[in-house]
Curated annotation (Swiss-Prot):
Protein name (Swiss-Prot/TrEMBL): Septation ring formation regulator EzrA
Species of origin: Listeria monocytogenes serotype 4a (strain HCC23)
Compartments it resides in: Cell membrane
GO-annotated biological processes: division septum assembly; septin ring assembly
Stretches that traverse the bilayer: 4-22
Domain of life: Bacteria
Length: 571
């Protein structure tokens, strides 16, 4: 019982202590909010309103002032009283230990203080701007009026440089003068904010006019003097070149100059209407056009030099290529008496011949036009370059065809010599096989030997045809060469097999009397070797039989054969 009482007392003390601590924290927060409220109340809103109220206000300025004063009245009559009530509520809830309710009230107070502070900032900021704008307007209006007076004086002293734009500039200045009068009127009436807007607009407009007055004289100088002079110089240069024999009708300069004059008139209207950006763009574009015409004239002068330098050499090239083409035609006629010339090959010559005729015709037409002065030198230059390029192609194609014709005789002689060489190669191969003293030749080899002879016969027969078809000769020639290679390979293989069979049987004889199976298989191998001449099969049977008796024996025999060691010396 005693311990229960002690525990209860401890709990009560803890609760009272916790309540005291929480209560203290809430009072601390309420005091902070109270201090913030007092600081807001001390802000000089009423003093600033009184200062502005002393000014003479009208229009937009008066409406703004009334809105600020109405906003302050709302703060004084509603927002601050509401704030006091919520502060009192927070204190009462704290005294009664209603800490949750106290916290809610404190949060509401913070939000209310934010609203009041924001509203007061707007009022004070607006009042300050109004007071500053009055002072700033006074300073800037003086500077603006002085600048305006300078512009007026400049127009009076330099107006002659503005040409036909002068009335438009003066009209702009008159509009600004009226705006400045409106500024004075609004200032006298107390509408300082609207007056300030007018000052800002006038300042910007004066900057625009000042910049325009700087640009107008140079643009008028371009449209009235520089561009017309450039066009006159261009026309003079054009006419001088025409007198010297240049054909320049393709430029249509009279039409183009008329068009450019219309462009100048349009640019001048743009300047008078103060559309200076478009005028400047037009001036730049027209200068570029004139430069292009000069480039064209310069190109014609360069082209004339090229034509005079290259006309005769091109004529010489044409004559030389004509001579080459005629000689090639004679060569074709001669070759066709001996050799068959394919239609495709003749088509190549006919095509190049047609190209040459076209180039010759184009050159003759060009020469006539140059003599009569009816072609621009630039066009003549292009035509000469095209003819020269065509002649280079024609020359290469005809040289290639001529070389192919010359190679026909060379290829014929080589084919005849090679046919003889292949016959000698067969005889040499036959003698080599005779020296080997083979038991006989198998049917397969005899068939290849016969086919080889027929291939050479076919080639030699083809070489006797008139006219000689070298494409067919080349085909028969290739077949004969392939057959000779195949026959030689077969002969070498057969002789190799014969030597190996003899070595294997000779080595196997050491086991022949002791091994009946080996002896029987060796007899079978010998039958193939001596009777039907199947040397490869005989080798396979003999090797298989020997390997059954002595594994690896064939490798030893092969090694001894390659090293030219006697079979009897193999261990």
């Amino acid at each position: 019982m005693y311990y229960m009482l002690i525990g209860f007392i401890i709990v009560v003390i803890a609760v009272i202590g916790a309540g005291y601590i929480l209560k203290r924290k809430h009072y601390q927060r309420i005091n902070e909010l109270e201090e913030k409220k007092i600081k807001l109340r001390e802000r000089p809103v009423i003093d600033e309103l009184s200062k502005v109220k002393k000014l003479k206000l009208t229009g937009q300025t008066e409406a703004l002032f009334e809105s600020w004063r109405s906003s302050w009245d709302e703060i004084e009559t509603r927002l601050f009283p509401d704030l006091e009530e919520v502060l009192l509520e927070a204190e009462m809830n704290t005294d009664r230990y209603k800490f949750r309710s106290a916290t809610n009230a404190e949060n509401d107070i913070e939000q209310m203080l934010v609203v009041i502070e924001k509203q007061m900032d707007q009022i004070l900021g607006g009042l300050k701007e109004l007071l500053i704008s009055e002072e700033k307007n006074a300073k800037e209006s003086r500077a603006t009026k002085e600048k305006f007076a300078e512009l007026r004086r400049e127009v009076l002293t330099r107006g002659f440089k503005l040409g036909e734009t002068l009335p438009y500039v003066e009209a702009k200045l008159n509009e600004l003068s009226e705006s400045l009068n409106s500024y004075d009127s609004l200032t006298d009436q107390g509408d300082h904010l609207e007056a300030r807007e007018i000052v800002i607009v006038v300042q910007k407009e004066m900057q625009v006019i000042e910049a325009q007055m700087e640009r107008i004289p140079s643009l008028l100088h371009e449209t009235d003097t520089i561009l017309p002079e450039e066009m006159n110089k261009l026309r003079a240069g054009y006419e001088e070149m025409v007198r010297k024999g240049y054909y320049l009708a393709q430029m249509e300069l009279d039409k183009e100059i008329s068009r450019m004059k219309n462009q100048i008139d349009k640019m001048k209207k743009n300047v008078i209407n103060l559309d200076l950006d478009e005028a400047e763009q037009g001036v730049e574009e027209l200068h570029n056009e004139i430069d292009l015409f000069y480039d064209t004239l310069e190109h014609e002068a360069e082209a004339r030099h090229f034509v005079k330098e290259n006309h005769s050499p091109t004529s010489d090239k044409l004559q030389r290529q004509n001579a080459v083409s005629d000689a090639l035609a004679e060569q074709i006629t001669e070759v066709k008496q001996t050799y068959h010339v394919a239609e495709d090959d003749l088509a190549v010559y006919l095509k190049t011949s047609a190209k040459l005729s076209e180039a010759k015709e184009n050159f003759e037409q060009l020469t006539t036009l140059i003599a009569s002065g009816e072609i621009a030198y630039s066009a003549a230059q292009d035509t000469l370059k095209e003819i020269d390029a065509a002649l280079i192609t024609i020359s290469a194609e005809q040289d290639k065809f001529a070389e192919e014709l010359r190679s026909l005789r060379k290829d014929e002689l080589e084919a005849r010599d090679d046919a003889e060489r292949m016959r000698r190669a067969i005889i040499t191969l036959d003698r080599k096989m005779e020296r080997e003293r083979l038991p006989g030749l198998p049917e397969e080899y005899l068939s290849l030997r016969e086919h080889m002879g027929e291939s050479i016969d076919t080639l030699e027969k083809r070489l006797e045809e008139k006219p000689l078809n070298m494409k067919a000769v080349s085909q028969d020639w290739r077949i004969a060469e392939e057959d000779l290679i195949h026959l030689t390979e077969k002969a070498e293989e057969m002789m190799e097999n014969v030597r190996l069979v003899e070595h294997v049987i000779q080595y196997a004889n050491r086991y022949r009397l002791r091994n009946k199976e080996l002896a029987d298989e060796l007899v079978q191998a010998e039958n193939h070797f001596y009777n039907d001449y199947q040397y490869k099969k005989a080798l396979e049977i003999a090797v298989t039989a020997l390997e059954k008796v002595e594994t690896g024996a064939f490798k030893k025999v092969e090694k001894a054969y390659a090293s030219k060691v006697s079979v009897d010396d193999i261990e």
